[in-house]
């Protein structure tokens, strides 16, 4: 009997210890997890609602969008000139100006923009280089005397001649260099460089070695750089203004014609002289050589000029007029 009581006591003690150890373990777990917060999600991100499409509506194709753009471009022009300085360009045709009006606007732009009054004035010409079937005018370089020169420096001109008296005449008339074979050798050795080169006809055979070196500046009859009147050639090239067609674009010529502080009449006279010289390089009976002309300053936009009054007209002989009649 006593043995049975002792066994029951041991079992109760063991059970009590097991229960206490379990309680301690659970309390330790609770103390560790006090600071842990488990977020409860009470909401969800709203999903994008599908676009409501009307019955019968269709998405525009790229062709339809292009048609809409073309309709905008084809909007009829407004009548007259814009009344304000700010306007939609597509609603008005591009303005075409007389030379006097264009010069007046350039001077006005300079005042409004607070730019230099002595800035350069440029003439941009687009040319029709066609001569006939598969023939074009070659890009050319030319020198002319402007009615109102504006360059601050005189060009350096070299004169080729073996005649001692002609060398003296050249030096007296302002030639930078003058001579024969000795001058040719110095140019060949790059000891001398000039802006322009002129020659008398007798020395031309000896100049052949300089043809590639001088390139576009090589003396030619078509450029009036070969002749016997040395003072006249020097007068042209010392104060002359060079114009040339862009070799890359082949039909574009850009040149400085004046400064903005010159009078309107002086700028117009220089412009007319340049156009006359350009038109000399293509027969007049083939039609207008100059297709478009823009006048601009260093800081302004280009103003489209009315070109027809500026182009030289073909003079018909009386005999040809009778034949036409």
Curated annotation (Swiss-Prot):
Database matches in SUPFAM superfamilies = Ribosomal protein L1
Which Gene3D superfamilies does the UniProt entry name for this protein? 3.30.190.20, 3.40.50.790
Keyword Transit peptide: yes or no? yes
Localization: Mitochondrion
Q: Which InterPro entries match?
A: Ribosomal_uL1-like, Ribosomal_uL1/biogenesis, Ribosomal_uL1_3-a/b-sand, Ribosomal_uL1_mit
Q: Which UniProt keywords apply?
A: Mitochondrion, Ribonucleoprotein, Ribosomal protein, Transit peptide
Transit peptide per record:
1-50
Q: What GO annotations for molecular function exist for this entry?
A: RNA binding; structural constituent of ribosome
Recorded GO cellular component terms are: mitochondrial inner membrane; mitochondrial large ribosomal subunit; mitochondrion
What single Pfam family name could you report for this chain, choosing any that match?
A: Ribosomal_L1
Record note on quaternary structure? Component of the mitochondrial large ribosomal subunit (mt-LSU). Mature mammalian 55S mitochondrial ribosomes consist of a small (28S) and a large (39S) subunit. The 28S small subunit contains a 12S ribosomal RNA (12S mt-rRNA) and 30 different proteins. The 39S large subunit contains a 16S rRNA (16S mt-rRNA), a copy of mitochondrial valine transfer RNA (mt-tRNA(Val)), which plays an integral structural role, and 52 different proteins.
Protein name as catalogued: Large ribosomal subunit protein uL1m
């Amino acid at each position: 009997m006593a043995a049975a009581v002792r066994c029951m006591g041991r079992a109760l003690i063991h059970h009590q210890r097991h229960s206490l150890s379990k309680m301690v373990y659970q309390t330790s777990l609770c103390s560790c997890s006090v600071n842990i917060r488990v977020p409860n999600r009470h909401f969800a991100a709203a999903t994008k609602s599908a676009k409501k499409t009307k019955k019968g509506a269709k998405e525009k194709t790229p062709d339809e969008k292009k048609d809409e753009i073309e309709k905008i471009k084809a909007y009829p022009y407004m009548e007259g000139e814009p009344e304000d300085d700010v306007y939609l360009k597509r609603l008005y045709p591009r303005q075409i100006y007389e030379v006097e009006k264009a010069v007046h606007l350039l001077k006005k732009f300079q005042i409004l923009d607070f730019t230099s009054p002595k800035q350069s004035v440029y003439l941009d010409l687009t040319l029709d280089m066609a001569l006939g079937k598969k023939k074009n005018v070659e890009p050319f370089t030319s020198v002319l005397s402007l009615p109102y020169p504006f360059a601050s420096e005189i060009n350096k001109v070299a004169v080729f001649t073996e005649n001692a008296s002609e060398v003296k005449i050249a030096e007296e008339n302002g030639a930078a260099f003058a001579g024969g074979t000795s001058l040719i050798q110095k140019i060949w050795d790059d000891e001398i460089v000039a802006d322009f080169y002129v020659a008398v006809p007798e020395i031309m055979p000896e100049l052949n070695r300089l043809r590639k070196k001088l390139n576009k500046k090589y003396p030619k009859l078509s450029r009036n750089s070969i002749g016997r009147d040395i003072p006249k050639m020097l007068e042209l090239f010392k104060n002359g203004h060079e114009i040339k067609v862009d070799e890359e674009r082949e039909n574009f010529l850009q040149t400085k014609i004046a400064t903005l502080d010159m009078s309107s009449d002086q700028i117009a006279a220089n412009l007319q002289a340049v156009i006359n010289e350009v038109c000399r390089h293509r027969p007049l009976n083939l039609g207008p050589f100059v297709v478009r002309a823009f006048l601009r300053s260093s800081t302004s936009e280009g103003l489209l000029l009315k070109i027809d009054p500026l182009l030289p007209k073909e003079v018909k002989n009386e005999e040809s007029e009778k034949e036409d009649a």
